[in-house]
A protein has these predicted regions:
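Ser/Thr-rich, low-complexity intrinsically disordered terminal regions
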Residues: 4-8, 12-139
Length: 139
């Protein structure tokens, strides 16, 4: 029994090191089909600046940013419920403002199932809410 516990802790430690050392994906990486989009009256260049400055908070870290593509890659750290996520924030000009599309992908590549999807959707929605709050203050 003690041997099983020790082996389990070693496996969790190895996965944690793998996830912590994993670099942000390339700027053009597809982070999956599940996306959330919302419109805003803020121009695309200002939305990009807000998304790029969002990692000033303790929750997110800037992975990559490309103003020409209107894309920011953010990441967050591990928690008790997840190994952390990579987020892509795509900003596109639209009539009367811009459209922001957010997607998320787990840092640990071998995760699937309804519980994982629910946690990923909740994490993505948390980022969407943070962006909306920052944009409301930026107008």
């Amino acid at each position: 029994m003690l041997t099983g516990l020790i082996i389990g802790l070693i496996v969790v430690a190895i996965i944690s090191v793998f996830v912590a050392k994993r670099p942000a994906p390339p700027i053009d990486a597809d982070l999956g089909p599940d996306k959330v989009s919302f419109g805003t009256a803020t121009p695309a260049d200002q939305v990009f600046k807000v998304a790029e400055a969002l990692p000033v908070s303790a929750a997110y870290k800037l992975g990559r940013a490309d103003a020409g593509r209107g894309r920011v890659i953010l990441s967050d750290g591990m928690t008790m419920n997840s190994y952390g996520y990579f987020y892509s924030v795509d900003i596109a000009p639209a009539a009367g403002g811009s459209t922001v599309t957010v997607s998320a992908k787990s840092k640990y590549p071998i995760q699937f199932g309804p519980i994982v999807r629910k946690q990923r959707d909740a994490a993505r929605q948390k980022l969407v809410d943070a962006l909306k709050a920052k944009l409301a203050g930026a107008i």
